[in-house]
A protein has these predicted regions:
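Acidic-glycine-rich active-site phosphate/pyrophosphate-binding loop
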Residues: 1-11, 43-56, 242-261, 293-311, ...
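N-terminal signal-anchor module of multipass membrane proteins
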Residues: 6-41, 45
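Conserved phosphate/anionic-ligand binding catalytic regions in large, soluble enzymes, centered on
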Residues: 20-36, 264-281, 323-326
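Hydrophobic alpha-helical bundle architecture
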Residues: 37-38, 286-299, 309-375, 388-395
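Signature of multi-pass transmembrane helix bundles
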Residues: 109-261, 428-436
Length: 436
């Protein structure tokens, strides 16, 4: 068993990374930054300038904004200024009303908002907002590296907060605290399977929120309605009425609603609601239909979510690699555990996932993310089925090595560094295509 001090630090890490969110986290992070700048200014700004990293732009261009029936950054920025509350974090717009949405639309139409690509930065998650009023006062708020992490706040040139970013953990010598919380797949598995149950029951909230989001989504017509399609006669006729089809339907329906801008909270993972859904719903549905115990489900959810957090530590919050690869790898581990697998089989499931999905490109948050989530989740089930029979991709195949942690590093090296040019080309295509 992992000692109490290390368990405490891992639990703190999980509670930072597994948090509720309403709407896609990138536009919500921009709304949060606008809300903070507005609160610092002390009045509704007459003009707002937003300087954003390429990955923030990419993930905010085509996704629905909760409660608005609108898509994209301008309305998210306007509502952040008019009604956003920074104390709500990624639920910054949870109190928005129809009347306030109308005010937000007017704010956008008055062309008070300017959005720019921030040049000369290395951070893939960067949001800088400058809010000004008619009297010439200004306030600046900057978020970087994490969706809710403010690194600088200014008012009229006076610095109120300044927390320069440290180098990424992989670029500097680890501190004692880093070493205490340094993860490997073995440590993730041991934590999930041996930690006293009462210490990890907080993860049940992920089940409650994401299961509710999945159910609510089936009541409406959101996005491409993939989840609904899979649950109807056509879907059942082709996919069958099985654990597999139920997993796909439950997971994709929650993603349908979220990407369409439904005001339904979900439990996110590492700054992504879709990743939180993908870490949760496949595990929950499998456990229910496989008749696993409540304890087994709780431990499987911890294993799924913590595996995703571990992979994201070296990948980064945003990258050219689709996040469903990471989250679905977590759910593959959770499902393998629920099938009765031990550490060896869980490691096999990770190798199977990397052998299949490495290189899936992220082309921004949008309704079609439900399709990618379903691809990831279906691969998770297949990977677990192979792993539980001790079948796995081997050292002779592509990115796979005998050491599973090195396999994970191979995946994240590609996503964090190797696909940077791909990322630039994707954004170029997205910003120059003709939309009619």
């Amino acid at each position: 068993m992992i000692n109490q001090k290390k368990r405490k630090r891992i639990i703190e890490l999980m509670k930072r990374e597994v948090v509720p969110a309403i709407g896609c986290t990138e536009p919500m992070a921009v709304s949060l930054c606008v809300a903070k700048a507005t609160e610092t200014l002390g009045c509704t700004p007459t003009h707002i300038e937003a300087y954003l990293s390429a990955n923030i732009l990419k993930n905010a261009m085509g996704v629905g904004i909760p409660g608005t029936r609108m898509v994209g950054l301008p309305i998210a920025i306007a509502l952040g200024a008019l009604v956003g509350k920074s104390e709500y974090g990624l639920e910054v717009l949870r109190d928005v009303t129809d009347a306030e949405v109308a005010q937000g639309k007017q704010y956008v139409e008055e062309q008070r908002i300017s959005i720019h690509l921030k040049d000369g930065i290395d951070e893939k998650l960067y949001i800088e907002v400058i809010a000004t009023d008619d009297a010439g006062h200004s306030a600046t708020a900057i978020i970087a590296r994490d969706h809710t992490h403010f690194i600088r706040i200014e008012k009229d040139g006076e610095v109120l907060l300044n927390q320069p970013l440290k180098k990424h953990q992989t670029e500097e010598a680890p501190t004692k605290d880093d070493e205490e919380c340094e993860l490997t797949l073995r440590r993730v598995f041991d934590f999930a399977t041996t930690t006293p149950l009462e210490e990890i029951e907080f993860i049940k909230e992920a089940r409650r929120l994401n299961e509710n989001a999945s159910r609510e989504a089936l009541k409406g017509n959101y996005g491409h309605s993939l989840g609904k399609t899979l649950s109807r006669p056509l879907g059942k006729g082709i996919m069958g009425d099985s654990i597999f089809s139920h997993i796909l339907s439950a997971t994709s329906s929650a993603c349908d609603a979220r990407m369409a801008g439904a005001s339904i909270p979900v439990m996110s993972n590492s700054g992504s609601g879709n990743q939180g859904i993908s870490c949760t719903m496949p595990v929950v549905v499998f456990a229910e239909e496989n008749h696993n115990t409540d304890e087994e489900l709780t431990r499987a959810l911890i294993l799924s979510h913590l595996t995703a957090i571990y992979i994201k530590q070296s990948l980064g919050k945003l990258s050219a690699l689709c996040g469903c690869v990471v989250a679905s790898t977590g759910s593959a581990c959770g499902i393998t555990y629920l099938m009765g697998g031990g550490y060896k089989q869980v490691a096999y499931s990770v190798k199977n996932m990397i052998a299949n999905l490495a290189g899936m490109v992220c082309d921004g948050a949008k309704p079609a993310c439900a399709l990618k989530v379903t691809s990831g989740v279906s691969t998770a089930v297949l990977s677990a089925m192979l792993a539980i029979q001790n079948r796995h991709a081997t050292n002779a195949e592509g990115l796979i090595e005998d050491d599973v942690d090195r396999c994970i590093r191979n995946l994240t090296r590609i996503g964090a560094s190797g696909m940077n040019e791909t990322d630039r080309m994707v954004l170029d295509i997205m910003t120059h295509k003709s939309c009619k």
